[in-house]
Amino acid sequence: RVLFRSVILEEGDIINVDCTTILNGYYADASRMFVIGRTTAQKQRLVDVAWECLKVGEKVCSEPYVFVGDLGNAIQKHAHANGFSVVRDLCGHGVGCHFHEEPEVEHYGHRGTGMLLVPGMTFTIEPMINTGTWRVFIDDEDPYGWEVISEDELPSAQWEHTYLMTENGVEILTH
């Protein structure tokens, strides 16, 4: 197992960098994947499918008044169709004056369920896509309490944007 505080990155590693910003009292959240040099075809495919899952979620939100379950269902179908799983223990979230607000934006689920995403809402889409099981744990030795590891310790990938739902669909706030 690799601990973030002591790791030396090596050729083929994939890493996620997740950043939160606060501007004028409002939060935004984003993460990006990086490939160190050349990696295996499987890891590259994982990174690519995780990006595609983010874009699938965006497409579902191209019009307002969609359910969180619509978004989650589409992401889950895309990940599974490509042989990957979607983490269920972590989800996207509303953002605003607080870092984590309603709604919880699950990246799996059933169409027509969950909160309705309406104009004026700000939220993240951040599917964590795993090579193996969807189950994860938080590393007990992580001093920040936020190093997430897949239960089977196989590679994971995650991209994230913060969005504003408008009358015309989502606007990406974290380009």
List each model region and its residues:
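Active-site neighborhoods and metal-handling regions in enzymes and metal-associated proteins
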Residues: 1-175
